[in-house]
Swiss-Prot record:
<keyword id="KW-0624">Polysaccharide degradation</keyword>
<dbReference type="Pfam" id="PF00933">
    <property type="entry name" value="Glyco_hydro_3"/>
</dbReference>
<dbReference type="InterPro" id="IPR036962">
    <property type="entry name" value="Glyco_hydro_3_N_sf"/>
</dbReference>
<dbReference type="InterPro" id="IPR036881">
    <property type="entry name" value="Glyco_hydro_3_C_sf"/>
</dbReference>
<dbReference type="InterPro" id="IPR026891">
    <property type="entry name" value="Fn3-like"/>
</dbReference>
<keyword id="KW-0136">Cellulose degradation</keyword>
<feature type="glycosylation site" description="N-linked (GlcNAc...) asparagine">
    <location>
        <position position="13"/>
    </location>
</feature>
<dbReference type="GO" id="GO:0030245">
    <property type="term" value="P:cellulose catabolic process"/>
</dbReference>
<dbReference type="InterPro" id="IPR002772">
    <property type="entry name" value="Glyco_hydro_3_C"/>
</dbReference>
<dbReference type="Pfam" id="PF14310">
    <property type="entry name" value="Fn3-like"/>
</dbReference>
<dbReference type="InterPro" id="IPR050288">
    <property type="entry name" value="Cellulose_deg_GH3"/>
</dbReference>
<feature type="glycosylation site" description="N-linked (GlcNAc...) asparagine">
    <location>
        <position position="627"/>
    </location>
</feature>
<dbReference type="InterPro" id="IPR013783">
    <property type="entry name" value="Ig-like_fold"/>
</dbReference>
<dbReference type="InterPro" id="IPR037524">
    <property type="entry name" value="PA14/GLEYA"/>
</dbReference>
<keyword id="KW-0378">Hydrolase</keyword>
<comment type="pathway">
    <text>Glycan metabolism; cellulose degradation.</text>
</comment>
<dbReference type="GO" id="GO:0008422">
    <property type="term" value="F:beta-glucosidase activity"/>
</dbReference>
Amino acid sequence: MTPKFDIDYVLANITEDDKIALLSGSDFWHTHAIPKFNVPPIRTTDGPNGIRGTKFFAGVPAACLPCGTALGATWDRDLLHQAGVLLGKECLAKGAHCWLGPTINMQRSPLGGRGFESFAEDPHLSGIMAKSIILGCESTGVISTVKHYVGNDQEHERRAVDVLVTPRALREIYLRPFQIVARDAHPGALMTSYNKINGKHVVENPAMLDIVRKDWHWDPLIMSDWLGTYTTIDSLNAGLDLEMPGPTRYRGKYIESAMQARLIKQSTISKRARKVLEFVERASRAPVSADETGRDFPEDRALNRTLCANSIVLLKNDGNLLPIPKTVKKIALIGSHVKTPAISGGGSASLEPYYAVSLYDAVVEALPDAEILYEAGAYAHRMLPVIDRMLSNAVIHFYNEPPEKERTLLATEPVVNTAFQLMDYNAPGLNRALFWATLIGEFTPDVSGLWDFGLTVFGTATLFIDDEMVIDNATRQTRGTAFFGKGTVQEVGQKQLTAGQTYKIRIEFGSANTSPMKAIGVVHFGGGAAHLGACLHMDPEQMVANAVRVAAEADYTIVCTGLNRDWESEGFDRPDMDLPPGIDALISSVLDVAADRTVIVNQSGTPVTMPWAHRARGIVQAWYGGNETGHGIADVLFGDVNPSGKLPLSWPADVRHNPTYLNNMSVGGRMLYGEDVYIGYRFYEKVGREVLFPFGHGLSYTTFHVSPEATVSPIVFSSDSPPTATVLVKNTGPMAGAQTLQLYIAAPNSTTPRPVKELHGFTKVFLQSGEERSVSIHIDRYATSFWDEIEDMWKSEEGVYQVLIGTSSQEIVSRGEFRVEQTRYWRGV
């Protein structure tokens, strides 16, 4: 049990140095302790879809939940609350008091590298999902840190870019999810973003931080993103409480100097220290484990499976191709994702999972009597797959000297694969600024032939196989996007190998500062990283031919492919919406021979181009599904779960159609949010542009009827008694299922341009076949309000408001109305 401390007593008695120490982290994950006054260190931990703990390298395995867009696609408050509880319990097992999540930035572009981390393109849906998962997490005693406040909606030059956005768009779109969280959840911490907003970094922008504390009357601990503090004086005076990580770069002795010059007041230091102590006092109540451990329990697996299955969106099901009958005799599974599931995106979302269920294993389990044919068809990886199951006796040795010198071994760590990130690794005597490491292990290939090897590095590295150099990624390097945007491109080498023969693999690695490559706008965590991958060299045309052959033979074909953490990750944005090279050709070739019995399962966190969509009878969007990816997909494909997911973002047919196409990267250090409030479906509806699949879309194996007239009461809007819209919904189909009713508001004509309609409520209802139920959706004052830039306030405009209830943004099934009798202005939440 952590000893208690009195905040006022501590502040009155600690030294100035102790106060200043509180204002920055002690190391990569912890706050400073003051043992004399029983002030403990508080442990923070990533990430958005699972709890990694304190180690990027050789971390303790963890539960991996579906990605943010997958959770958003459930449109299910209760499930998100349960997900939050699971994350909180995982934190406790890892000894962590504070979860660095959720992410609630906006997917203004389908190309954003971290788009998969956030819930939705709509601020209302994003805010409600965030509120639910936060309340679940904090019910365990763990503090949530909602992030990234605000405008970190793309990765390109994220530390340097100046986001130019109108006050109206800032308030109505980008701040709104945080505002909902402030109103409904009051999490204990808020993380600032790396970027600038309208000329000034958020972390040192008093106007932005005052919105939180003065406008919304929410007073969380405000911490920086990791290495996202850029000044001493401005950040402290603006309201940043905690610089992370430690050791400090801008506080400590620099605060002392600024105080001597009276650039920072003593009262400011005390105020910031008080907030840190309040955070520590609250966080220290969490009953965390003394050691980092796992907790892989059956009930957690069941929840993860439910989360995955309920997130899956049935995009297309012509002729009721799905569900596939379990009596099928022969089924073809095609795609590299079949045996290598994409469980998460990259960056802060990466972790070592307890396990990962592949679709192949799940189908074998679901169809014990069927003949299952498998072909990869085309590789979907960007970096060659890491070596793991064919690796044995692997360790990494650490030194302060390069391999050509006489050197002293400082540490040895066992490894289970050939990828490592050392940003938070340390060992006694190791010079973190400049060190070297040697990975050695035994590789036993399972197939004879020519093997491709790929080596990507943040630092420098060379690969030797049986002491023969195969790849040199040290002498000449080309910058790529790996490792948060700091790594090289993948350098490739080849070697002829024999199945069953054991080969000695050796990687000579130099830490980050051994590389001359530098980049603007990316986060330099230090330490370095490397990824060695390998696979049998294959002829792409022959791979497709093999896939076509099994598709032609089978009664049903499932093509499961898409993106993965190589393509969607923190640190870089996608250059286009395309699937990996060769995937579209594979799908088209399979459809040529088996279009009437083929289901396409796409795994990605954000939209991809589907030039073959008009030919496919069945299309399923499966996101990144976490530990239970294979089970979740199979449950839907074979009808054990009736799909109920709805798209949390619009799915454009072409990347050029999206509203940010001309403004999706830093140009001259700035990024113009030229679409203003017209993000996602707001844009497509305003300009009348068709999308491939609309926001809120998702099919079911059953059918529903909704009463065409919504009863809205009271008919006159009052903030003291806001209206509720009520409809009858009936399951008119053959099986139980869930329908999400989405409430959109169409504002009256105004001198201020408004979107055609905006989401302001939703509810998900589960009904047995033939069951009918009355369903109500509450309407709050946000539904009638827009940000008046002249008055600098919210404006609720008089007039008649249309209530449009739909099963997607384009399928409006019920209507009603209410009126606002008098225009009012307001602030706050």
